[in-house]
Regions:
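Short hydrophobic beta-strand element within catalytic cores of glycosyltransferases
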Residues: 311-316
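Conserved donor-binding/catalytic core segment of Leloir-type glycosyltransferases
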Residues: 155, 206-231
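Aromatic "clamp/platform" in nucleotide-sugar-dependent glycosyltransferases that forms part
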Residues: 294
Length: 396
């Protein structure tokens, strides 16, 4: 099958969508499919294809994290996509490149698959002042309803995506395809004891201290402020448990000040942004992954931590019900309150080495089917369904 993946950002940028698209591309290529990635590139002034990637001219945007923003319409881009002769067009974002994918699918009479990766209601504060959030939400819902209705098939990494589409008036069912992780890169067998020791030395963490980490971009939607508040209310220095916040973002300064104001700055480490290829020893040097975020659909950072053996403590999410990623007693625990979070942290800290080894093995086992092959298989089945259901298209 010939598949065109449309994404606003791609390597060398790193975010959840980029990671998902890269793993999907790798899995599809391994299965013998042909893949073209169509992406914005603010470093070029003309369209060109290299190594299976169609680079599209774009303008660098400070508002969108320094990524490129491309025009949705380009005859040259359409011609290059047409030359690829795609059987399926699969869009992963909703802006210039995503709209370009919708336009190309319509012009070329190709089935369109649309993956919703982000709960955009949680991100509207980036583009609209507080007093206009209600209006912005309505406009956003109208826009995403158009996108959803344009697609032949919808996918999303968690049941929360189905809830969102139903809320905005899209009647189609969502094919839930969990996110994937590069299992080999995060295997604890490939991370040396020296690299793990170096992490603790760098941040002056004693050997008897347990480290709970959160990994992600530091924006309000990640609820790290809630995590800090929970920490201040329930964890003391005598617990010998530290919180390591790995990542950078627009509210990092606010969070660092919050930790000081709460009097917990001696128990909290802010590493700032860390290159993705340097992340494996960061995860492996910690003991547990903890998050209070309710905005994630299916956290790739959490999966990466689990691939290194980190049990997860996650705040209960009524919409997501967490059933797709965290299973109590198998690979982590769901908490409903700061007290429950603290109790689980202390319980894990007090496990014997044998008990901890069994738990870590269970965590790793739980993500063994979360690699590139599984993602490609799930997605290929959706492509087959889209081709069967689309007019003027023959299933391959």
């Amino acid at each position: 099958m010939r598949i065109a993946l449309f994404t606003e950002t791609y390597l060398p940028h790193i975010n959840g969508v980029v990671t998902h698209v890269k793993i999907l591309r790798d899995g599809l290529l391994q299965q013998g499919h042909e893949v073209l990635v169509v992406t914005a590139d603010y470093q070029t002034r003309q369209h060109y294809v290299k190594d299976g990637i169609l680079h599209c001219p774009a303008i660098k945007s400070k508002r969108f994290y320094g990524y490129g923003v491309a025009s949705p319409f380009s005859r040259r881009r359409l011609k290059l996509v047409q030359d690829f002769r795609p059987d399926i067009i699969h869009i992963h974002n909703e802006f210039g490149i995503g709209l370009s994918g919708i336009f190309a699918a319509k012009q070329l009479h190709v089935p369109l698959v649309y993956t919703l990766h982000t709960m955009y209601d949680d991100y509207l504060y980036y583009v609209a002042p507080r007093h206009l959030l209600r209006v912005a939400k309505k406009i956003s819902h109208d826009y995403f309803r158009l996108l959803g209705n344009a697609a032949t098939e919808l996918t999303g990494p968690s049941p929360k995506c189905q809830e969102y589409f139903q809320q905005i008036g899209v009647k189609k069912a969502v094919n839930v395809i969990p996110n994937a992780v590069e299992l080999d890169d995060f295997s604890p067998d490939r991370i040396s004891a020296e690299n793990k020791s170096a992490f603790r030395r760098r941040y002056h963490i004693p050997d008897d201290v347990m480290v709970a980490c959160f990994v992600g971009r530091l924006g309000h939607e990640k609820s790290v402020d809630v995590l800090l508040d929970y920490w201040a209310r329930t964890i003391t220095p005598e617990d010998r448990i530290m919180l390591c916040i790995i990542g950078g973002g627009p509210v990092q300064g606010e969070l660092e000040q919050q930790a000081k104001d709460l009097g917990i700055d001696s128990m909290v480490i802010f590493t700032g942004a860390v290159p993705h290829d340097q992340m494996p020893p960061y995860y492996a040097s910690c003991d547990v992954y903890v998050t209070a975020s309710l905005s994630d659909t299916n956290s790739i950072s959490m999966l990466e931590g689990m691939a290194t053996g980190l049990p997860v403590l996650r705040r209960y999410d009524a919409l997501n019900e967490n059933v797709d990623q965290v299973r109590n007693g198998v690979n982590g625990y769901i908490f409903n309150s700061p007290e429950e979070m603290a109790a689980e942290l202390r319980r894990i800290k007090n496990l014997s080495p044998e008990q901890l080894s069994i738990l870590k093995a269970s965590v790793i086992e739980s993500v063994k089917r979360s690699g590139a092959e599984a993602l490609a298989n799930y997605t290929y089945n959706v492509y087959r369904k889209a081709m069967a259901n689309a007019p003027n298209s023959k299933e391959k």
